[in-house]
Amino acid sequence: MNEVSKQAKQSPRLRMNYNFHKSLDDKCHRMLNAVEPGTEIPIHRHPTKDETFVILKGKVKVSTYNNKGELQDFAILCHENCLYGVNIPKNVWHTLEVMEPSMLFECKEGPFVPHEEEGILNVTLK
């Protein structure tokens, strides 16, 4: 985990994955996702896939939105709040805000499809 966190800090995107799956075509994607404050994850959705996040360290806000980009709900994943994970159902717009250096375990169905192909919500958040 320390090496993945170090790579995230050095990455221009301020995040780095360590994949447990062998191929982007695998049917189940399981990964560590090291994320740093300031990383930008667009509001996106996965039309046919649920996505699960489990916090291993740090603090992350997971937000969901409607089709107009209006906030619907949020959860702050961290050990202090005793909220360790969340499942985002398929086709739900969502994003993450990294509140402190964090490590997540992430799981979703494969194969990999870039956000640009699955859907990015182009709105300006208020």
Where are these regions (language model features)?
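Short beta-strand His + acidic residue motifs that chelate non-heme Fe in jelly-roll/DSBH
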Residues: 43-44, 62-64, 85-88, 94-99, ...
